[in-house]
């Protein structure tokens, strides 16, 4: 999974033409009362695009609106290029997908969505604190949380290997049905460390990266959160030299001994390869790795189970990549754009698209974590049942660098501060040296 990339003004100018050359789907309705141009992520599961197209067509015909749809690839940062080009030109789509801190980047150019968010919460319950952190800016919700494009990077492990080498029965902790939270009470970072050691000694090291790309940033960030270790607090104060941060580094010093030797150079495909090749007992990734294994290594896929990450002293955190629908304030048909955005996030539409995507997308509301698709997907049956966050998981959504102010957090995320600190542990640096390096980096962000 790739994280969002920063796009410069120059690259937007150079590549902005790409936005005009995207594949279009034009839905023309009889007696149209208005026009919309909307952009969506070009889903890696093609039937999900087909479902989106059907839903937009149904809404357009009912509301007498001409709608042009662009499915924009995430390859080459095309979504970010499109955002930057349109923000500069003040013209383009009526709404686009925005990921994580991209809402903050364009907050002043996005139409407030307070009315839509309120309507959704009145009907389906509250959004998470992380959604609010990323999207409620300067007193207003600037974008609507979306299921399409939202995913987490929970544990995906080999059932047989964890049981044989670490004595852990994953299905007992996280069965494919509602369970008692106490069943997973022992799934802690202490026991995670023991399991990592046992599996490494057996030749199946956990594929957890300490590289510079998104998976490494996300998968290390949850360790900091689980220990209550903030590098920068909500006030924007540097807090890197804390007991909690030292605890994370001490824990990392034990963990890195049991990770693959090339862990510092991991990219976003490395953990996938480790699982699919049969070399790793556990990775943290959405079901895309398991899905590829179904095709390329079916025996591996049949032995995989997705489940929440371990708990630390301050709780259990799962790494998320969050998507939002944002309506440009300079758009020509903002009311219709907001109405379409809301329609697409209502339960019936979310469920239809999730079914088409084989459960890959995650609804932003816990009340929608009960779709049948997660029970039905196989092999083995129920393998991704615990991929969405269930009420009894006793877990929290996490975005690395929270709760630092978004302007600062986005820079910390982009510079991969969290995994780099653990990579320095891997290279043998002391806590004091690592904290001094991190402080110097952070001071550049908070100025």
Question: What are these model-predicted stretches?
Answer:
Residues 99-154, 303-310, 382-384:
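Hinge/lid segment of periplasmic solute-binding proteins
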Residues 94-97, 281-285:
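Paired acidic/hydrophobic, glycine-rich loop segments that form the ligand-binding mouth/hinge
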Residues 154, 225, 249, 303-326:
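Periplasmic-binding protein-like
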């Amino acid at each position: 999974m790739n994280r969002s990339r920063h796009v410069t003004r120059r690259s937007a100018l150079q590549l902005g033409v790409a936005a005009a050359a995207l594949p279009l789907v034009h839905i023309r309705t009889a007696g149209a009362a208005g026009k919309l141009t909307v952009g969506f992520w070009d889903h890696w599961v093609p039937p999900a695009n087909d479902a989106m197209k059907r839903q937009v067509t149904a809404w357009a015909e009912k509301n007498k609106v001409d709608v042009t749809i662009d499915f924009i690839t995430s390859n080459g940062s095309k979504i970010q290029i499109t955002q930057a080009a349109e923000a500069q030109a003040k013209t383009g789509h009526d709404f686009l997908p925005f990921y994580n801190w991209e809402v903050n980047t364009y907050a002043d150019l996005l139409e407030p969505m307070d009315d839509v968010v309120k309507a959704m919460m009145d009907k389906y319950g509250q959004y998470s604190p992380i959604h609010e952190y990323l999207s409620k800016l300067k007193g207003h919700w600037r974008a609507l949380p979306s299921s399409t494009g939202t995913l987490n990077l929970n544990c995906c492990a080999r059932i047989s290997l964890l049981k044989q080498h670490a004595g852990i029965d994953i299905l007992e902790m996280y069965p494919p049905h509602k369970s008692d939270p106490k069943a997973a009470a022992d799934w802690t970072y202490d026991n995670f460390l023991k399991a990592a050691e046992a599996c490494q000694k057996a030749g199946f090291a956990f594929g957890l990266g300490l590289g510079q790309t998104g998976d490494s940033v996300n998968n290390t960030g949850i360790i900091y959160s689980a220990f209550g270790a903030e590098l920068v607090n909500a006030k924007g104060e540097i807090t890197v030299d804390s007991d909690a941060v030292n605890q994370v580094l001490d824990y990392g010093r034990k963990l890195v001994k049991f990770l693959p030797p090339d862990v510092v150079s991991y990219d976003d495909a490395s953990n996938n390869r480790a699982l699919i090749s049969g070399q790793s007992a556990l990775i943290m990734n959405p079901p895309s790795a398991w899905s590829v294994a179904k095709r390329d290594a079916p025996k591996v896929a049949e032995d995989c189970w997705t489940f929440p990450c371990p708990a630390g002293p301050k709780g259990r955190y799962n790494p998320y990549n969050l998507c939002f629908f944002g309506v440009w304030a300079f758009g020509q048909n903002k009311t219709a754009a907001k109405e379409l955005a809301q329609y697409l996030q209502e339960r019936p539409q979310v469920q239809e698209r999730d079914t088409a995507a084989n459960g890959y997308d995650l609804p932003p509301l816990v009340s929608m974590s009960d779709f049948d698709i997660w029970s039905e997907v196989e092999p083995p049956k129920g393998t991704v049942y615990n991929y969405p966050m269930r009420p009894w998981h006793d877990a929290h959504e996490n975005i690395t660098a929270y709760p630092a102010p978004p302007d600062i957090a986005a820079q910390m995320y982009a510079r991969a501060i969290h995994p780099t600190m653990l990579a320095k542990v891997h290279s043998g640096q002391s806590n004091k040296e690592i904290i001094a390096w991190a402080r110097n980096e952070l001071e550049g962000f908070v100025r």
